[in-house]
Amino acid sequence: NFNHISFCLGNALEVDFPKYNKCVSNLPYTLCEALLWKFSREDFESLVFVVPKKFTGRLTGIVESRLKLLIDAFYELDIFDDVPPEAFDPQPKIMSSIIRLKPKKGNLFLREFFMQYDKKTKNALREILMKSGMTKKEAIKQVSISIPLRIQEKNIVNLSLEEIKEVVRGFIGE
């Protein structure tokens, strides 16, 4: 009896997910990062994925990346086991890993910031500051003195790791 299981067919980046509390998937390796950004906007208990082993290095911070900041803001990460290429048909050319992600409260500033990944940096920051009680005028002024204009004009999704760190330093001093 599989009444409690839903299968979602289609491009995972384009389809609306059905209501769920857990997701298990062998993610398309070329879409892992994009899908983690999409899942950050979803409400769930846990995600269990098979991903490239090298990708787990980006999740844990072994390789410094924007993705590590996303993980820190949204997820508790467990890496369970490595899966050799022979376990698949057809075989990938690389090792894989099984990971579990659970939502966490995380850094509220980073969470709010990343949730608006499709907006310009200055607009997202202005909205965050207005939610914290500033007027629109005060928020615009604070953004203009805290963040260089070249960063303000970029969409969050296009910011480099260094630019994200600069935003964080400008607002929460880390």
Regions picked out by a protein language model, each given a short descriptive name:
Residues 1-112, 163-173:
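Catalytic cores of RNA-modifying enzymes
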Residues 87-90, 94-168:
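An accessory alpha-helical subdomain
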